[in-house]
Amino acid sequence: GKRVPVPEGFSAGARCLLESLNVFLSALAIMEQQGTEVSLASPGTWPLTPELTAECFLEAQPIFERQAAIWQNVLEDRADNRELEELDGFINNTSIRLRLICKETAVELPGDMYADCWEKHEIPPCTLVKLPHHGHRDSITPHLLDMLAPKTVVISVSNTRTDDCPAASVLQMVREKGCALYVTDAIPDSNGHVSNHLAIHFDI
C-alpha cells in the first residue's frame, strides 16, 4: 500500500501524525485485500442486538473538512509542517463518541476527545465512562462529571507513559465525586511501588 514520507525536519507532533497515517494506510490496504467493508462514520443510533443499542456522536462538520484537506495535501505529496501541527492540536476532537445502552446501563466511550469540546453538549447521565486520552488533565472537568454522573470511571493507560497520564488532578476529581475508579495499569505510589489493583472486564 501507499506510504508517505516522514521528514526529519518536521516537528515531533507532525512526524507522529505521519507515522500514524502510514500505520492506517497499511491496515486499510490489508482490509481492502480481504474485502472488508469500510465506510465513514456518521452520527446515528443503531440496534446491535434486541437489548443493546449504539449511539454515535461526532463534532460539527467543519473540523472534519479541515482534517480531510490536510490529509489530502499529505497524500498528494504536499505535506506542510505547520498544517500538521494545526491538525495535531485538534485531531483528538475528531474522535467518535460512542454510547452503548443496554436496558438501564449506559457506557460512554468518548475516544480521545478533550473535555472542553464535548462538555459543550447536553449529555445524559451514564453508568460508566471511559475517560478520554488516558486520563490526561484535559480529559474531564467537574462540570462534565456532574453532567455524566457516572457510577464508575475507567482509565485506560500504560505504566510506561511519561506525560502525566493519568493526571493526579483527574484522579482526585473522580474520587471526590464518589465514583468507583478503575485503571487498566496500576498507578505507582510516591515511592514508585506498584500494588495489586482492581481490573475491569466486559462481556458483550
Positions of predicted regions on the chain:
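C-terminal regions of proteins
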Residues: 143-149, 154, 161-204
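Active-site-proximal loop/helix segments of hydrolase catalytic cores
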Residues: 69-166
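Flexible, acidic/histidine-containing loops and adjacent segments that form or flank the divalent-metal
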Residues: 1-107, 179-187, 191-204
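Short Gly/charged-rich anion-binding patches and loops
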Residues: 23-26, 140, 169
